[in-house]
Amino acid sequence: MKRSEVDRSKLSPMMKHYVELKDKYEDTIILYRLGDFYEMFFDDAEVVSHALELTLTGKSAGLEEKVPMCGIPHHAAEVYIDKLIKKGFKVAICEQLEDPKNTKGIVKRDIIEVISSGTIINANSLDEKENNYIGSLYSFGYGYALTYSDITTGEVYSVLINSASDVLYKLLSLEIKEIITNNEIDKALISKIKAQKIPVTIEEYYLTDKYLEVYENIEDDRIIKSIQLLLYYLSEVQKRNLSHFQKVIIKKDNSSLMMDIHTKRNLELTECLRTKERMYSLLWLLDNTKTAMGSRRLKYFIENPLVDITKINERYNVVSKLLEEFILADELRSDLYEVYDLERLCGRISFGSANAKDLLQLKNSLKVLPSIKEKLEKINYYDEIRPLNELYELLERAINEDAPNGLKDGFLIKEGYSSELDELKSLSKGGKDFISNFEREEKERTGIKGLKVGFNKVFGYYIEVSNSYLSMITDDMGYTRKQTLANCERFINPILKEKEDIILSSEDKIINLEYNLFVEIRDKCKEYIGILQNNAKVISEIDVLSSFAYVSEKYGYVRPILNSTNEIKIISSRHPVVENVLKDAEYVPNDIIMDNNTDIILITGPNMAGKSTYMRQLGIIAIMAQIGCFVPAEEASLPVFDKIFTRIGASDDLVSGESTFMVEMMEASRAIKNATSKSLILFDELGRGTATYDGMSLAEAILEYIANNIKCKTLFSTHYHELTEMEKTLPNLKNKHVSAIEENGNITFLHKVKDGSVDKSYGINVATLAGLPKEVIDRANIILKEYETKENKKTSSVQIALPLNFEEKKSVVEEELKKIDILNITPIEAINILSKLKEKVK
C-alpha cells in the first residue's frame, strides 16, 4: 500500500498527522514515536524492513486494511539509525512532546532532528580521530564557494573554487560526507558528486537572521551565501542548535602549503595508497597524541602545512623545549591522556543531547586543566588555557559519579545539591523501608512464612502467597485477590496501596526534578562553550606538538633550518615510514643537496632500486618541516615551499576515468601552470604511459620548461637514459642515479643515490629477480644485443616488462615474486614483501 494512494479523509488522526509530516520530509525516513517504539509506515516501513531485515507487519489506521508498519525499540534506536545512515538514508526523529499519561486525546508530536551522513552526532557512530564534514556548495556562474563544517565540533571553513573538476577533488580531499547546494549548480557536476557516493540535497533558502557571528566581518557575498545556505539547512531543516558554531575560517591559496589530492595520496600522508587505511601513512607514524582532538588536529596540520616561517619556528621552539624538559613533557602527556573530547562534548551540550556521562567527562577534563596550564607556562607556550574552576566545582557538586546514561532513570544528582530533591528521596526511602518492614510484620501477623511483597508496573505493590499457604488466608486479614498464577496468588490491602501512592508519587517527582536539575546544569555549561572551545584548541595543538617531540626523540629526528636562499641541504635523509617498517633491517640514508645553481635533479636507475622512495622522502620531509615537526636526517636546511606537485605511481584518475597517460599529462599540466619558483615538483618516470619517443620527447620538453621558466626545485626520475644528456645543455639540471651491483648476472640494489647517470639498464636483471623462466631471459639477452648493434639506437638497453603468468614453478619464492604487481606496488609494500621473502630463504 502506497501513501500516495490512500484516502486521507479516512485516516485516523494520528496517521493523518504522520502523512502530513511525511509530505514535508519526502526524502527522509520518519521514525514516529509511539510509546516505547519508533514506528514507520507505508513506503518507509517497506524500505526499512528490507534494509534492516525487520518484520513487516500492519497497523490499523482507519482504512479497510492495515497500513504497512515496522518498528524498533526506542532504547535501541541509535543502533538502527546508524545502520540506516550507513546505507545512505536520512532519518527524521518524530518525538512525543507531551507525557501520554497527562494528555487527553492525541499526544503532540513533531520532528525534533534530522540525521544524515554529514550530521551524525552519536559518538558511537563516529570515528573519534576523523572530522565528519558536511558542505554547502554555492554556484555563482564562474566558480563556486564551498563552506564545510563538522557540526560535532563547530568548526566552519570556506573556500572559493574555480572549476567543477577542482570541486570534485576538493570534496574528495576533505572527505566531505554530504553536500547541500542551490539550483544554479550544474547538473553534470551533481551527477559526478553523487557518483562518488556523496549525497546531494538541493536547497533554495538562506538563513539571514541567525548565527550572524559565524560570518561576522566577511565581505565576500559568495562566501556569505554559501554559509547562509549551510546554516539554513542545518538550523531550519535538520533542527540543529548551532550556538557552538565558531567564526568561519577562510581558506586562501597562500595561507598554507598547497597540495592537491594526488599529492596527498601519492605521498601517503593520511592513508596508505594500496590499503586506503591509516597504517603505514605519515599520519599513522606521527600520531602519538593522547586525545581524540589532538589526533584530528594532527591530520589537519598534515593536510595544511604552514608557510609562515615565524609560526613554524614557534612550533619548533615548543618541540625543542619539550625535548629539553623531558620529565615535564612526560607528565604533560599523562595529563593530556585524562582530557576527553572537549570539542565534541561542546557540540553535544549545544545540541542538548549531552547526558550525565558527558558532563562527568567534562568535569574530569576540567580537573586536569590547572596542571596542564602550569606546565605550559613553564615552557612559555604561546597560547593560554582557562581552567574554569567554578564549572568544575558545579559538576563535582551536582552530578552523581554512577549516573546512568538515561536522563529519566534517576540517580543523576548527588545528595546535598538540592534540598527539595533530598526531601523527596527521604520520603521515598521511608516508604521503601516501610514496605520492607511491612513484609516482615505481615509474616508475623499471619503466620505465613511464604509471604512476599513484590512490585510490577501493572499492579504496583502486591502480596504474594504460594499455593501451599493459601488456606491460611482469612477474610479479617483485609486481603483482596488481584491475580492467580500457577504456583501462587497475589493480593493487595489498603495499607499497602496507601504507601504505594506515596512511594510512586515521590519517585515520579524525583525523576522529573532530577531531569529538570540536570537540564539546568547542562544549560549552565552552554555559557562556557566559547572558553571550552578555545581550551580544546590549545590542548589539541599542544597534544600534536608533544607527539612531534615524542617521535622526534624516539626516531632521532633533527630540527630543520628554514632558509630564504632556496637551497636544500639534507644530510642522511630517511623516509620516516619506510625506516619504521624496516625495523631491524638497515635503512640506507641519502643526502639531498640542491644549491642555488641546481633546480632539477634527474634520477636514473633500475626499477625497485629506490628512486620513488628518494623522491617521496623529500616531499615528506618538506611537509614535516612545515607542520612544525623535526625531520628524519642528521642535518636539514630547506626553503619553505608554497606548493607541492607530484606524479608518483601508475594510478588512474580518481574521478574522470581517464587513462594513466592522460592523467600524467593532466597532472604535469597542472604543475607547470601553477608552480612558482618556490614550489616543489616530484615527477616519477613521466611519459612512460605512451610510446617511447613520444614519452621521451614530452619528458624532455617538460624538463626544459621547468628549468628555463619555473626554476623550482624538482626531482625527476626517468628510464629514458637519453635525457641524461640534458645536463650538458641545462646548467641548473644535475644527474644522479640509484646504484646497484651486478655480479654473475645477479643484481644487488644498494639504495644509494650517487652523482652522475647510471651506466646501463638493469631491466633484464629485474625480470630475472621477478622469476621469469630462463628461456625468456636468455631470449631477452639475445634481443638486447641485437638492439645494441643497431646504428641509430641511442639507448644501451630497453627495460622489458612481460606478464608474469608462466606456469613454470621452481620455488615458493619465485611463485611469490610472480604475484607482485611491480607497476602498482608502493615502497612500503615492497619492503614488507622483501622482508617475508628474506625469511623464507634463510
PLM features per residue range, with description:
Residues 1-321, 330, 334-337, 341-350, ...:
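Charged catalytic and DNA/RNA-contacting regions of genome-maintenance
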